A protein has these predicted regions:
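Active-site neighborhoods and metal-handling regions in enzymes and metal-associated proteins
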Residues: 1-220
């Protein structure tokens, strides 16, 4: 199908080399997304005329057809079932005191693997307990994984790939009693989430403009 429409797929590692070769064809015009980095623009513009404009491919991908939308909903429902089973398991398991960041990661994978059309995780799971939750994109390893206790909070950022959709869900799970500081911080973040969730704004408003709503409770 792709060959019939003159589409060629190249190895990603050859991207720079192929871009340079393409740009050296004087008769060619190259369109680059405004989000492209300076290195790509510089490489391409050395030999060819470059147009900076949103990618038509990205726009087509952003417009979902009814089949895709239905698939997303089914994937979300199945992933929701897996998450509910996991949370129920975690509530009992943490009381025993034998679970770690790595073991809950593995258990969540098991619950997802039970679901129809499961193909794998959509990214490496972030299971951060207590201070580890503050590490951006933390990933537990056998060397860093710490045991869970029936206290404090567990940050769980995870997702799955299903044949008909991809999921990404983040939850902050209270495992037991919290300190007063933890309660305050949790409540302030929740207020920010609700402010952003319920915001009404005109078309054309940027995410950076709305970001203040998520932070204003903490600033006060």
């Amino acid at each position: 199908y792709l060959k019939e429409h003159n589409v060629e797929i190249e190895d990603y590692k050859n991207f720079s080399k192929n871009l340079k070769a393409f740009s050296e064809k004087d008769e060619e015009v190259l369109q680059i997304s405004p989000q492209a980095n300076e290195a790509l623009y510089t490489l391409a513009s050395q030999h060819t005329h470059v147009i900076i404009a949103p990618s038509p491919v990205a726009l087509m991908k952003a417009h979902k057809n009814p089949t895709e939308i239905a698939g997303f909903r089914k994937a979300m429902e199945r992933d929701g079932v897996a998450m509910v089973k996991f949370l129920r398991w975690l509530k009992d398991a943490v009381k025993v005191g034998e679970e770690t960041e790595l073991s809950v990661d593995e258990k969540l994978y098991e619950f997802r693997a039970e679901q129809e059309n499961f193909k794998g995780i959509s990214f490496d799971t972030i299971a951060g307990y207590k201070e580890h939750a503050a590490i951006v994109h933390y990933e537990a390893t056998p060397e860093t994984s710490i045991p869970l206790k029936p206290e404090g909070m567990l940050l769980l950022d995870s997702g799955a790939q299903y044949l008909d959709g991809t999921t990404d869900i983040t939850r902050t799970i209270v495992l037991g009693p919290l300190t007063e500081e933890e309660k305050k911080d949790y409540t302030l973040v929740l207020k920010g989430h609700l402010q952003l969730q319920n915001a009404q704004f005109p078309a054309g408003t940027c995410g950076t403009q709305l970001d203040v709503l998520a932070r204003i409770a903490m600033w006060k």
